[in-house]
Amino acid sequence: EDNSVNEIIDLEKSLDTISGFFKLSKILKKKNFDRVYIFNGSLRYNLIAKHAGIKSIFQYPLFTSKDIIFQTAKIFTENSIGEIVDTQPSIKSDKKKSDMIFDKNYKHIILGLSASGETKRWGVNNFVKVTNKVSREYKCKFYLAGGSSDQKIIDEFISKSESKNFFSFTNLNIKEIISIIKYADLYLGNDTGFMHISSALGVRCIGIFIDSPAYAYSGYTKNIEAIIPRGETINSTTHNTNGRDKISSDDVIKKVLEYIIS
């Protein structure tokens, strides 16, 4: 829990409508906010804030789009509060250890097999090739990061893998997941929320970017190394790159072994 967050207002779908404009404005007005920070270039939110009677409105330039999200946020925040801010995130978890036992003779690796869309997934067979090779050379335990909707992907991976030393996150809540991730040696996987959580917990991450903005989603932290499609750069790899077939399992295996050795 974060004591600096007093309340979260859920921007549910109904608030996107015309009536939702006035509903959200009414909600904000009741809070008697004296200032608002809007981390996008939305004219709608600007007008809602004004309609709610908020006097001091800090916002990105209107209609800002296709920006490097962490850079824009950093510049905006520094200009708004007059202080230098660090883009390196940090999740502070309680000191209670996980109920699981982390054998130091093993390498504990978080696997991000899924992603928010099919084109962002490197593919189960590729991960099987990597984990089979790595587990032949080192004693490894793999933690399968995913929710209940990812069960089919996780089951496919387990059925095809040589190693059977797995633990799935599908039945855990976020606090339980964090208590495990923070003791991991490495995250390997697609561009997922689990990658960003791992990074914020100080875990080294190998992120496979095949169809999402590699620099925008990895450049904010020292903990994520982006693997990008052959022929692309970290800046050119973005939405619609469709680079699944341009990242070889051999290249990823080499990178994972480098991390394990170091």
Report residues per predicted region.
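Catalytic machinery of carbohydrate-active enzymes
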Residues: 1-262
